[in-house]
Amino acid sequence: MDEAYYSGNLESVLGYVSDMHTELASISQLVIAKIETIDNDILNKDIVNFIMCRSNLDNPFISFLDTVYTIIDQEIYQTELINSLDDNEIIDCIVNKFMSFYKDNLENIVDAIITLKYIMNNPDFKTTYAEVLGSRIADIDIKQVIRENILQLSNNIRERYL
């Protein structure tokens, strides 16, 4: 799908957009259906693993994050922005993103997770912050926020990126 997106072929681009629409809608419904069956500790561990590039795609919320990451990854500016920051600015970014986890706004939480994933692609930051990240996220219960906001967020992403 990525090759189609970048090829400039209108038919390929339309197919990519249609596929992403369908995948996002489908995975959002699966998250709603399965979120109650996922233990919060497992959910948090899977979120940390997603950030650290070790995704458990059997967890529907992680599949949702992976789909969103794929869609947003087409917007290269995020990587370029993070690469332009110095270490102190990245540390500030990490601290600011952590604040999003304590708000009842799924869009901010997903944005924080994806931004942290971009940052943790840097092996130096992964080595330094992996343990802190894991312990901080382990204390958070976001299931209710997911349950209440997943459909709206899915719609927002489709409108904004597809």
Swiss-Prot record:
This is Protein A49. Pfam families: Orthopox_A49R. It comes from the Viruses. It comes from Vaccinia virus (strain Ankara) (VACV). Belongs to the poxviridae A49 protein family. InterPro entries: Orthopox_A49.
